[in-house]
Swiss-Prot record:
Family of the protein in this entry: Belongs to the P-Pant transferase superfamily. AcpS family.
Organism: Sinorhizobium medicae (strain WSM419)
Keyword Coiled coil part of the UniProt annotation: no
Name by which UniProt lists this protein: Holo-[acyl-carrier-protein] synthase
GO molecular function, a single term: magnesium ion binding
Length: 139
């Protein structure tokens, strides 16, 4: 069952301006080490950061909190599954909020799509609650 949906659309030039104006301070405040390594290695660095920024905004909306109520930028990070599909990795207050949302006997799956077409970057997040299979030998 779907328990959260969020989307965000951002102007890449806004992130480009923040990178130029605030540099490392902006990057280190908003992005995880994995995101920094991934984005800094890209040809279009600003677009890469913009997609990840939009993903964080979309995820915070799917959590139902926005960037408030104990949910912070660096607690939501874009990571890739072994096949390359992007998803969100949550820690701290973001992970706690996700646990609060989950019905008993369910686990979360976070679906993420990110894209860019200059000057825009977009992200869409769906949080799904999936039933956990009972352990063998239990009733």
């Amino acid at each position: 069952m779907i328990i959260g949906i969020g989307s965000d659309l951002i102007d890449i030039r806004r992130i480009e301006n923040s990178l130029q104006r605030f540099g490392e301070r902006f990057v280190n405040r908003c992005f995880t080490d994995i995101e920094i390594a991934k984005s800094d290695g890209r040809k279009n660095r600003a677009a890469s950061y913009a997609k990840r920024f939009a993903a964080k905004e979309a995820c915070s909306k799917a959590l139902g909190t926005g960037l408030a109520q104990g949910v912070f930028w660096k607690e939501m990070g874009v990571v890739n599954l072994p096949g390359g599909k992007p998803t969100m990795q949550l820690t701290g207050g973001a992970a706690a909020r996700l646990r609060e949302m989950l019905p008993v006997g369910h686990r979360a799956a976070i679906h993420l799509t990110i894209t860019d077409d200059f000057p825009l970057a977009q992200a869409f997040v769906i949080i799904e609650a999936l039933p956990v299979a009972p352990a063998e030998g239990t009733v």
